[in-house]
Amino acid sequence: MLPLSKMPVEAVRQVTTLMFDLDGTFVTEDNLEAETYQSLERVKENGIKTIAVTGRPAGWCDLMARWWPVDSVVGENGALAYSKKRGKIERLSFHSPADKVSYRKRLDSLFADLLTKFPGIKLAADQSFRQWDIAVDMAEESEISLQTA
């Protein structure tokens, strides 16, 4: 894929929305560089809608929707979306909020099954900030190498 700077000017003028991933794309090597963030500010200032799309948890998405120059954040691999509208956060979820408790029990049961098959696995450090998914630590903070995971 070519960088946006290589797009023809006419094509750039037709862009209305920029959707972007975080890990390994917008954020490199666990670092959000100032220049990258400033680029996002410039995109938004030029009237282009900005939407972050990530597998990261609801807690992270809430912060991004409040403080980042974005129109919306899609999080937990599409399970939820947060948008800032008139100074307030609008929260949408793929699943009905009424199903949250039963859904969580199902996920906890699935993780318990995984633990019997893979005793060394652990939940991701940010699991407590998640609403609709379970994240297994795949060498982010665990002692297990990514190859083993």
Residue spans for each PLM region:
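Conserved PLP phosphate-binding loop immediately N-terminal to the Schiff-base lysine helix
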Residues: 29
